[in-house]
Amino acid sequence: MKSMLVVTISIWLILAPTSTWAVNTIIYNVGSTTISKYATFLNDLRNEAKDPSLKCYGIPMLPNTNTNPKYVLVELQGSNKKTITLMLRRNNLYVMGYSDPFETNKCRYHIFNDISGTERQDVETTLCPNANSRVSKNINFDSRYPTLESKAGVKSRSQVQLGIQILDSNIGKISGVMSFTEKTEAEFLLVAIQMVSEAARFKYIENQVKTNFNRAFNPNPKVLNLQETWGKISTAIHDAKNGVLPKPLELVDASGAKWIVLRVDEIKPDVALLNYVGGSCQTTYNQNAMFPQLIMSTYYNYMVNLGDLFEGF
């Protein structure tokens, strides 16, 4: 009986997939792309990541931390057969690390230094399943935006240009390259995180990339503000009653002016995925009941910005 059990377990280990933690790899050919292909890539990523049973006011929500699969892989294919694979947490789309083909038939993995414990082991074995060809080159800094900005040598990521050509070029500076600086790595990560994870979370950021598809551009104040308030926006939409937020949400528009959001339909066009929030939420609401709120919101924003205008006098 014992011998049969050992044989059964051995066969299972041989036949089992290398990693049961990651969903199918989403592949995006950065080196040969179009606006339509970029949009399809982001939709594929959203569909792989979202919890199909969770939705608030028609906006899909990501799963909680206990839901399997736990991770999503995104393979970015650059020019000249250069590739980099990002590993994302499925529940929030945070980039945990990445891998690239290295030397002859080797897989080199890079992990942020704020990823620890079993998660760190998961990143290593998921990105590079074959232990015999695995090579480590750790990221010597954490994944927070302030750290990435500092390592990239800028005060704000608004100074780091985004764009398809820039992402393609940055892949070439990392993939298979023996040695590169922390600045080069941080610049690549700032661009990749915003054009993959942030664009998957926000339609507004996706549209910024599509509008500037054939040229480099600097992210505007609204882009940065959305990135920093995704959790707050998700909670506000989840807790809204008949489309009205529980309290005014103070955001920033593209020009940097205050933007006060009172209703779900004001922010909904900008949001593609909600961060996970526990508990039930409304899936739809009565549009006709929102007209008084529309008037109130217009008046509220007018008075707020009028107050800012006279503040300097």
UniProtKB/Swiss-Prot annotation:
Which residues are removed as the propeptide when the protein matures? 286-313
- Keyword set, alphabetical order: Antiviral defense, Disulfide bond, Hydrolase, Plant defense, Protein synthesis inhibitor, Signal, Toxin
Provide the tissue specificity. Answer: Expressed in spring leaves (at protein level). Expressed in roots (at protein level).
- Indicate which residues the UniProt annotation says bind substrate: V95, S143, S197, R201
Name the reaction it catalyses: Endohydrolysis of the N-glycosidic bond at one specific adenosine on the 28S rRNA
Disulfides per UniProt: C56-C281, C107-C128
Matches recorded under PANTHER family: PTHR33453, RIBOSOME-INACTIVATING PROTEIN (PTHR33453:SF34)
Summary of subunit composition and partner proteins: Monomer.
Protein purpose: Possesses antiviral potency. Inhibits viral infection of plants (tobacco mosaic virus). Inhibits protein synthesis. Releases both adenine and guanine from Escherichia coli rRNA in vitro. Activity on guanine is 20 times slower than that on adenine.
Q: Can you name this protein?
A: Antiviral protein I
Q: Which organism is it from?
A: Phytolacca americana (American pokeweed)
